[in-house]
Amino acid sequence: MENTLSALRSLMASHSPPLDALVVPSEDYHQSEYVSARDKRREFVSGFSGSAGLALITKDVALLWTDGRYFLQAEQQLSDEWKLMRIGEDPAVDTWMADNLLKEASIGVDPWCISIDTAQRWERSFAEKQQKLVQTTKNLVDEVWADRPPAEINAVVVQPLKFAGRSVADKLKDLRKKLVQEQARGIIFTSLDEVAWLYNIRGNDVAYCPVVHAFAIVTSNSAFLYVDKRKVSAEVKSHLEENGIEIREYTAVSFDVALLATDELDTTSTAKDTLAEITKQAEKFVSETNKSVNGKHQAKENSNNLIWADPGSCCYAVYSKLNPDTVLLQQSPLALAKALKNPVELEGLKQAHIRDGAAVVQYLVWLDKQMQDIFGASGYFSEGNTVKKEELSQSLKLTEVTVSDKLEGFRASKKHFRGLSFPTISSVGPNGAVIHYSPKAETCAELDPDKIYLFDSGAQYLDGTTDITRTVHFGKPSAHEKACYTAVLKGHIALGNAVFPNGTNGHALDILARIPLWKNGLDYRHGTGHGIGSYLNVHEGPHLISFKPRNVPLQSSMTVTDEPGYYEDGAFGIRLENVLIINEADTKFNFGDKGYLSFEHITWAPYQTKLIDLNLLTPDEINWLNSYHSRCRDILQPHLDDAAENEWLKKATEPVGV
């Protein structure tokens, strides 16, 4: 790590202009949350492997910013050369740079790895001291990363209409209506899931996310896909061409954005067809325009139409090639269109979650038996003390990794399975307090029947993406552990039962999940709910349920998770998570003619009643729990062929408090 920092500082000093600081974001050229191995630049320089964070390297310090989900993980992974900066507690990165760097300091960043919003916010922070945000002509981390993984050539595939629910033609038609409404003659898409959704394609370029590295440009009469053509089969080419989509090389996007800015994008010729020619043109253009953030191509004076770019997801390199006076900086219309699931997508999600729930039950049945047979645990249902066995003859060592591999195996046996939707969080005892803990085979813990076990996992199926968290104990939980679990469950129930008017933002509902914890002086450092894709990203916007405000109303046909938690450092973690669909509510009245909304659970797996202190639940909460368990049993039993599994599920969903 020390050698890496030294090498970067040497490049910073020799850069033109010399750099006083270098920013290394987590994101790739598409502002992705999850990135491919070759794009994990921040992880390479810092050693921190969390999905969110930003590294800043100056001449004499190295700092890492991350949010509350990763405080513990960052403390464990950062070496002595690095200082952890806690988002929400320490100064924001732009504030720190403005306050601590010298007047007229030059701060370098790869403009492809930073959003328009972020870059402009930083420029405002730097203005008082005349500090400059400098676009590096090359990514400096790539220059020192000797064994950087090579780019993979993964095939693009068509997402069939029977799963997508809407044709590309219909999606393009709706999109072009939006362009007319906003007086825009073109729009640029850089988010991988938006490109995949719009063109009904999927890929395998990013682990856990069925997307392909690609850009898209759509105008009033043309559509382009920028992708490594080696990934495109004859079938995919035919699918795209039938929908009027021209395929161009991935690296051509830089050149074509500049042509779009000056209204010279050639919408008829496909002569620029070779990778070598496109790369040469793109590199020439980048070298001319990336010298500073002020290098912009101006649109023609007689052009009154706008170019639409999403400031939150579009990279600054793209914006730097446009005339700022003719750019419409507004959220992508696809963000909301993708979040509003069509009937086929909703049905697919429901079916995927049923199969996924069956896999989770099979896993719990297997794990319960292993814990009893190997460790002498009292098991999932009983609260007796663990009877330690003198000799443990384990054919399979029960570690956080080996048991999560077993869970993946159960999922892999299900119809339409294509992989996991994120790295499984399989955590025992104190590891559960690391909110996004990712176990490694070399260092992970063994399961312990006397400690809480939390698993947060999900899968990618052709008809939907899943995400579920359950927390269990195979021994005798303490009264404190029960009280904490019950508080989390109460918040989970309260949010899932909410009825609210149209126009309500997720921020307004977040408190419902936290109140039972707050009453006990407890809380959690993460959001409560996120959207989920339809065989796409497991984290999907634009809506959220969070303590952080976001002005995006919840709407009917959106999906959102319900996942409160509680984490006690050095002891345990508790989280419960279901995926919900937002529906129109059938209310007795309709005050203000607003219309009201409610949630529908589509995740099916039992809550461990042994961990619940029933004295802390209200009669209504007990009724809800029993009703959910009854439906869970009815829905999952047809998908369990083994009699022992059915018997286990029946016992796990027996009514309580009656």
UniProtKB/Swiss-Prot annotation:
CDD domains: APP. It catalyses: Release of any N-terminal amino acid, including proline, that is linked to proline, even from a dipeptide or tripeptide. It is an enzyme of class 3 (hydrolase). Mn(2+) 2 binds at D467, H530, E563, E577. It is a peripheral membrane protein. Its cofactor is Mn(2+); Zn(2+). Its EC number is 3.4.11.9. The keyword Protein biosynthesis does not apply. Binds 2 manganese or zinc ions per subunit. Keywords: Aminopeptidase, Cell membrane, Cytoplasm, Endoplasmic reticulum, Hydrolase, Manganese, Membrane, Metal-binding, Metalloprotease, Microsome, Nodulation, Nucleus, Protease, Zinc. Induction: Induced rapidly after rhizobial inoculation with M.loti, peaking within a day and remaining at moderate levels during root nodule development. GO terms for molecular function: metal ion binding; metalloaminopeptidase activity. Homodimer. Interacts with N-1-naphthylphthalamic acid (NPA). Interacts with NBCL/BOP2/COCH around the plasma membrane and in the nucleus; this interaction disturbs its regulation of the nuclear transcription factor Y subunit (NF-YA1). This is Aminopeptidase P1. The lineage of its organism: Eukaryota, Viridiplantae, Streptophyta, Embryophyta, Tracheophyta. The gene is APP1.
